[in-house]
UniProtKB/Swiss-Prot annotation:
This is Small ribosomal subunit protein bS18. Signal peptide: none annotated. Binds as a heterodimer with protein bS6 to the central domain of the 16S rRNA, where it helps stabilize the platform of the 30S subunit. Part of the 30S ribosomal subunit. Forms a tight heterodimer with protein bS6. Keywords: Ribonucleoprotein, Ribosomal protein, RNA-binding, rRNA-binding. One of its GO terms (molecular function) is structural constituent of ribosome. The lineage of its organism: Bacteria, Pseudomonadati, Bacteroidota, Bacteroidia, Bacteroidales. InterPro entries: Ribosomal_bS18 (IPR001648), Ribosomal_bS18_CS (IPR018275), Ribosomal_bS18_sf (IPR036870). GO terms for cellular component: cytosolic small ribosomal subunit. It comes from Bacteroides thetaiotaomicron (strain ATCC 29148 / DSM 2079 / JCM 5827 / CCUG 10774 / NCTC 10582 / VPI-5482 / E50).
Length: 90
């Protein structure tokens, strides 16, 4: 049987290539300048089930707004609008 080189291999269907969606900062896109710490339902989008703040690489926010989210979450925790730690928050 003859050896096929890499250029001779043909597929019936082309191999699927996973294309990652580009992450974007939702605050810059929608023009939000102030993150309200008194809105716990909005802040819960940036927390995991344990109540920890999700990192930028997951949420896609910019550094500037990630710092503002962290500050807003900490203020909401201090005012008892959000729990410090929890099990199955969502």
């Amino acid at each position: 049987m003859a050896q096929q080189t890499q250029s001779e291999i043909r597929y019936l269907t082309p191999p699927s290539v996973d294309v990652k969606k580009k992450k974007y900062c939702r605050f810059k896109k929608s023009g939000i300048r102030y993150i309200d710490y008194k809105d716990p339902e909005f802040l819960k989008k940036f927390l995991n089930e344990q109540g920890k703040i999700l990192p930028r690489r997951i949420t896609g926010t910019s550094l500037k707004f990630q710092r503002r989210i962290a500050q807003a979450v900490k203020r909401a925790r201090h005012l008892a609008l959000l729990p410090y730690v929890t099990d199955m928050m969502k």
